[in-house]
Amino acid sequence: MILLPQSLFEQIISHARECAPHECCGLVGGNSTTTRTVYPLRNIASEPLVTYEAAPEDLFAAQRAMRQRGEQLLAIYHSHPRSKDPEPSATDVRLAYYPTAVYFIVGLGDREPCLRAFRISDREGRWEPVEYAIAADTNH
């Protein structure tokens, strides 16, 4: 199970809402199963309404910041702005290049946003839900 502090949950939801109707994307860094930092990335996909592609310079800057903070990539997030109960699309599965990362998907298709977590295996072409918990913020 992965722990997501309330403030990071709110940052991810806020990023998804800011980018809507386009998909948002970003990384989550931390240690072990505790997330510490959200790294919003720009979506430069040619069709941002239905897919995402992180801006390479944003991706490199986020990875550099993670190294400097002693963090590892724990999760990748993006949004499905019209989905009430998001699941990985065929494109999400095909482009899942980080098999050890958790993939968070934000659905904004209902009154309240829905955040779900998955492990995705691009080699096997499948995905499975992952449990996560929203934790009270702590001073780290």
Model-derived regions: residue spans:
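Conserved beta-strand-loop surface patch within small alpha/beta domains used
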Residues: 1-73, 82-140
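Acidic/histidine-rich, metal-coordinating catalytic segments
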Residues: 79
